[in-house]
Amino acid sequence: MNFSTTLLQWFAKNGRSLPWRETSDPYAIWLSEIILQQTRIVQGQSYWERFMKLWPTVSDLARATTDEVLKAWQGLGYYSRARNLHTAAMQIVERGEFPKTHKELKTLKGVGDYTAAAIASIAFGENVAVVDGNVYRVLARYFGIDTPIDTTGGKKLFQELAQSLIPSDQPANYNQAIMDFGAIQCTPTSPHCDTCPLCETCIAFREQHIDSLPVKSKKVKQRVRHLTYIFIQHQGLTAIHQRGAGDIWQGLWELPQAKHLDSIGEDTWKGHAQLVCKDVKHVLTHQILLADLYLWTPQNRPPLPEDFIWSPTETLEDYAYPRLMEILLQAIKKDERDLLCKKKSTITKQSTPFCNVKGRRLQCKRCPFDV
């Protein structure tokens, strides 16, 4: 029995049941592929369901605003995917129909070889192989290939090999089979070789170098970046601004950084601010961010760049933030909760502590500032 046939038989018994596999709608399939880039299925499925509920068709998504799309995407990371998704939706609507071929699909914003191959094969039955991390791993181990997968030659070799293996009558099932096989059976660490239907003919298993394949020649260098944020609260309003192009988190909102207060000098605000948390670590692909957060309640509004707005503090959740900013805002809520808890209105040895919040006495476990 050959490699492809074995994979298809394994898939028939072990393939994952996923909602976007129950439809031939190219919009639903495309949406799933974009969401699942750099995202685990267990997390991505809820976002797919959210997007399908908010925007059931590509026309609905095209009519949404960028801010609405970013807000719905919040928490998934790699926000350029959301911006590209929205742009591509508008491209499709402008053209009048969904692209049907691998070549046409690649003209959409944010759609590369892998995504185009997945959509073309699954939605339209085109005989084109997908090559992603799972596929690299399965093929490298089974065929014993030590050519680095992140080189031009390596990418070409694996793409040609993958294409030679795909059965012309089942491109959708085969592509989904090899991706599921890599995710479930031939995992990056601790693969399940004892139950693998391919182990008898797998070169890496036979030669005992499973852990060394696939090979990468480059290591991502991460630089450490220190950021200082200030939660400025004035008369129930908080300063925020939307990040521009040229750096991380384009289009997302954030609190002022220390650099935004250069006109008044650090000594002016820092002497009156409270340190809420220090060196909050957030890891990105190429950067390690370490963030400090201060709380400052000045008597007068400080001068800030023109792109800042003053939002009512209670409506801050309406904006789309990067994950680091979500963590810092949660820290502010917790800090406020802790301050309130120091002013408990009624505390006895026999009673449950209460806080006086907006004129109501609430148990701490029900406190709205509890995070």
Where are these regions (language model features)?
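Catalytic cores of DNA base-excision repair glycosylases
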Residues: F3-D194, L198-D211, V224
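Intrinsically disordered, low-complexity, charged terminal extensions of DNA damage-control enzymes
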Residues: M1-R16, E22, A183-V371
